């Protein structure tokens, strides 16, 4: 394995880079040389692994299913994984290794004081009280099927008091500064551990599961089957 260099990719947000680094360290421990490509944009990373510019990277089952494979929504984690694994092998010659129980799902986060004031615990509650709530998100939030347009198909129209667009990294700051009351969140966001913000219950199960999966080029697994075990 000493003469094999494995190129590990990651998307440009922190959780993806941390996962990529965990893969890299595990492979280095096993005696492989590793190159790290940790700033790949979301829309290029799949093509990069298909083209062999990288050998593996961490992905999420829900992203694979909806965005890459353009398949219909599925809420069962195992069905989602099985579909992705099968179709990746068939279409892209990519191997999807075992999924991780950790799931970085999509959700909506609110200022805790505002949620309490209006008795909002779930996304259905939010929809019923939307006219009192200032909502903010990225441009993707307002355009993508796994954003507001899709939410409205499941929950009905959200007649928000106002809608603001800003960069993803500023969303919790915008809530803390009292500019907005509700923003899209990842269920693993560190800010949700504070008392200031709450995650709303996706009571109609709109979002699919987002379990972490290592996506690997099949050629690499064929040449080095032990990589799958590491």
Range-by-range predicted roles:
Residues 38-42, 52-65, 80-81, 111, ...:
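Beta->alpha turn/N-cap motifs
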Residues 183, 189, 194-229:
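C-terminal lobe and pocket-closing loops
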Residues 2-15, 23, 32-37, 131-137:
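Short, well-ordered beta-strand elements
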Residues 77-135, 218-221:
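A conserved helix-loop-strand patch within extracytoplasmic ligand-binding domains
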Residues 68-97, 179, 191-205:
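Ligand-binding "clamshell"
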Residues 14, 35-47, 139, 161-173:
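Short helix-initiation/N-cap motifs at beta->coil->alpha
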Residues 25-26, 43-54, 149-154, 168-183:
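Short helices/loops that flank or line small-molecule/ion binding pockets
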Residues 23-30, 123-161:
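Ligand-binding cleft/hinge of the Venus flytrap
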């Amino acid at each position: 394995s000493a003469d094999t260099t494995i190129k590990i990719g990651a998307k440009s947000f922190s959780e993806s880079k941390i996962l990529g680094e965990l893969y890299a360290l595990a492979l280095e421990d096993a005696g492989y040389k590793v190159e790290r490509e940790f700033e790949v944009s979301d829309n290029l990373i799949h093509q990069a692994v298909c083209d062999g510019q990288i050998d593996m990277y961490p992905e999420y089952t829900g992203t694979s299913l909806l965005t890459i494979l353009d398949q219909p929504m599925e809420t069962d984690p195992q069905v989602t994984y099985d579909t992705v694994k099968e179709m990746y092998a068939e279409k892209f010659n990519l191997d999807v290794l075992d999924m991780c129980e950790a799931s970085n799902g999509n959700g909506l986060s609110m200022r805790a004081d505002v949620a309490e004031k209006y008795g909002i615990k779930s996304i259905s509650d939010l929809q019923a009280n939307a006219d009192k709530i200032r909502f903010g998100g990225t441009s993707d939030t307002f355009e993508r099927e796994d954003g507001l347009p899709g939410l409205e198909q499941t929950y009905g129209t959200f007649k928000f008091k106002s809608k603001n667009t800003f960069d993803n990294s500023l969303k919790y700051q915008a809530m803390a500064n009292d500019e907005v009351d509700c923003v899209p969140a990842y269920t693993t966001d560190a800010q949700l551990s504070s008392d200031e913000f709450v995650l709303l219950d996706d009571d109609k199960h709109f979002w699919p599961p987002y379990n972490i999966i290592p996506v690997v080029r099949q050629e690499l697994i064929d040449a080095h089957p032990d990589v799958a075990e590491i």
